[in-house]
Amino acid sequence: MLSKQKIERINELAKRAKTTGLTEDELREQKKLREEYIQQFRQSFKNQLHSVTVVDGAGNDVTPDKLKQSKNKYRNDIH
């Protein structure tokens, strides 16, 4: 997860961008922080999806094949 300070900085830069504008350095910093945030968000979301198993009313595993393949690839990549 992104540190609290980085999230606060993202919000500070967004607020300033709407009011007074940002310098070139601040725009680069904002872009870098946003990319880092999105990357961590996506990884967290993937981790959540890899812990999901879909079952029907009868208790049968009906997890989509694409998700099963992604889980297997993820497990093989980390081991």
From Swiss-Prot:
Q: Which UniProt keywords apply?
A: Cytoplasm
Segments carrying the region annotation (Disordered) are 57-79
GO cellular component assignments: cytoplasm
Biased composition of type Basic and acidic residues is found at 63-79
Output the superkingdom of the source species: Bacteria
Pfam families cross-referenced by the UniProt entry = DUF896
According to its UniProt record, where is this protein located? Answer: Cytoplasm
Family in the record: Belongs to the UPF0291 family.
Name of this protein? UPF0291 protein BH2353
